[in-house]
């Protein structure tokens, strides 16, 4: 598969002086105009990790872009959202973007654990039910995007004779599952779920061997499902910080992620999840993700000097990843 490069916009950075919301949308337009990025990503959460709401933000991004895929990684609120309303919202976005939407769903269970419980409580959604709700909602939205007069009797949602219009341009839009390392026996269950339910896998490298250990398992499950593992997309979500002093770049990234998510990532995990240093060092780290099996790497800059680093990414890193 042709390697792809995505740009993740720092949505929560609008809360701590990285950029304004209008600047974020303008950056999406700029990224599309460069022709260097295959996709543009934003995150999602309602109450657990507040940020500008993703569905509304996608409406603006669809209006100012023409070519890039518009993707969410991940739609953490998916298990608590009404699947009928969501199916209609996403179909409308696919119409607005002329068929450029990509949905990456996840359970939305985050650290500290009480954060996701706090988000689920107003909707009556427990953390224990999130994986099953994610799977059920995925089934529902796919049917609503491709069928008419849908009747559904699920564990959490039931309805009769529902038709969602307008139809999405894509039939249906792709749905990835985003998942990260978890202890057994949950790990095997999560990886099998990717192979049985998803059109692709999104993940983050929290240890050096994450992709090389987990991707072969997914490929085995894909073969069991009669699916071709060689055409299955794997999107690696990665951070970067460009600076001559690699340790200084790492320290800023650690502080940035602490502001972004709270004190939930160890220094070791941050180091594995972030490419730091000179353009040569950053490009080499990203190359390793492709070598480990990623078909796309989507990059987020973890620096308050975001605009200058974005310029460096375009001028000095991407040319090393896509030599002419």
Positions of predicted regions on the chain:
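N-terminal beta1-alpha1-beta2 module of alpha/beta enzyme domains
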Residues: 1-69, 128, 172-174
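Active-site mouth loops of central-metabolism enzymes
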Residues: 7-22, 74-83, 172-188, 268-280
């Amino acid at each position: 598969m042709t390697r792809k490069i995505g740009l993740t916009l720092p949505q929560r950075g609008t809360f701590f002086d990285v950029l304004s919301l209008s600047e974020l949308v303008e950056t999406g337009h700029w990224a599309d105009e460069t022709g260097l990025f295959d996709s543009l990503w934003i995150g999602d959460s309602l109450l657990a990790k507040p940020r500008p709401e993703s569905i509304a933000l996608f409406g603006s991004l669809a209006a100012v872009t023409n070519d890039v895929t518009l993707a969410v990684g991940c739609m953490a609120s998916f298990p608590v959202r009404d699947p009928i309303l969501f199916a209609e919202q996403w179909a409308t976005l696919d119409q607005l973007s002329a068929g450029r939407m990509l949905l990456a769903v996840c359970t939305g269970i985050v650290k500290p654990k009480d954060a996701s419980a706090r988000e689920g409580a107003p909707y009556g959604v427990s953390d224990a039910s999130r994986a099953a709700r994610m799977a059920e909602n995925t089934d529902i939205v796919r049917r609503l995007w491709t069928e008419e007069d849908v009747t559904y009797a699920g564990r959490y949602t039931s309805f009769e004779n529902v038709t969602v219009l307008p139809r999405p341009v894509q039939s249906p839009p792709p749905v990835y599952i985003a998942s990260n390392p978890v202890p057994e026996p949950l790990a095997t269950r999560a990886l099998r779920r990717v192979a049985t339910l998803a059109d692709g896998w999104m993940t983050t490298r929290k240890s050096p061997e994450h992709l090389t250990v987990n991707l072969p398992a997914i490929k085995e499950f894909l073969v069991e499902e009669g699916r071709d593992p060689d055409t299955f997309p794997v999107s690696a979500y990665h951070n970067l910080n460009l600076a001559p002093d690699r340790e200084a770049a790492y320290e800023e990234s650690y502080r940035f992620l602490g502001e972004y998510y709270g004190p939930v990532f160890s220094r070791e995990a941050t180091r594995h999840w972030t490419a730091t240093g000179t353009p040569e060092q950053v490009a080499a780290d990203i190359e390793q993700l492709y070598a480990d099996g990623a078909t796309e790497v989507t990059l987020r800059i973890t620096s308050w000097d975001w605009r200058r680093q974005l310029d460096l990414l375009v001028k000095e890193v991407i040319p090393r990843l896509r030599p002419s």
